[in-house]
């Protein structure tokens, strides 16, 4: 036995702590840990793969485009407003709202500082809903109400103005 560890409480945020790599390491060495397994973690942190799985299961998703660093982008084909975000990662780090081509060109460079692969999708104004599931049990649904235009990093971690409605008021037909 390489380690004398009862269990790892995985509270790492981002990167290897969330993308399945650390979880693979734990499993390789038979180390018990909290949180999702390697595959679930990998899929949760890869927006492109997650969208493909959702779409293949009949779940509506916004159309998206994958943009890799160094790839030429045809700006005349873009329809605004757009959301630009890293394909990997979370916490809305590197999330940008572009309302025109000038903003897009500026924000795409900033987003590439966070990741070499980006997701571009049409902006959709909707409600921010979270459905927590633990061990297959659905917990009360949460509506997140940000005082900012977008539910961004600041809204999530730095603002005391973000409100959480539990349970969310959702039409029972849904």
Tell where the protein language model's regions lie, with residue ranges.
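ATP-binding N-terminal substructure of ATP-dependent carboxylate-amine bond-forming enzymes
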Residues: 1-34, 38-39, 43-45, 49, ...
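Glycine-rich phosphate/pyrophosphate-binding beta-alpha loops
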Residues: 14, 92, 147-150
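Short glycine-/acidic-enriched loop or helix-start segments at secondary-structure transitions
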Residues: 19-21, 93-94, 130
